[in-house]
């Protein structure tokens, strides 16, 4: 079974480079440029094995809003929060939600490892 990931990142170069890297690892990737787009995909797609979301994005919904929407629909989905604006408070909030927290710049091999190991554990 193929791992399916939703990648939410407003920076187009970061999003595209990350998506290309994950696809080369045989991961199916859907992309969203903002929180609203991501929430629409979450509510209309059957399932995601993992969600990777930037914290700060333009628009109404931020990364934690996206993660909360995913967890309401599928609490077992692996969620990874990525931010260039890290703080102990943000990290604690993410961990309280059961979310993997990574600060930018993110190592793509590390991200792939988190996706594959966590998605495998959470897939029924």
Please describe what each predicted stretch is.
Residues 9:
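Conserved acidic carboxylate
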Residues 12-30:
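Two-component/phosphorelay signaling modules centered on CheY-like receiver
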Residues 20, 31-50, 55-58:
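Acidic, metal-coordinating helix/loop segments flanking the phosphotransfer/catalytic sites
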Residues 40, 64-76:
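Short amphipathic alpha-helix used as the core "switch/output" element in two-component signaling
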Residues 89, 106-116:
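C-terminal output helix
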Residues 93-102:
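As written
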Residues 116-124:
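The C-terminal output helix
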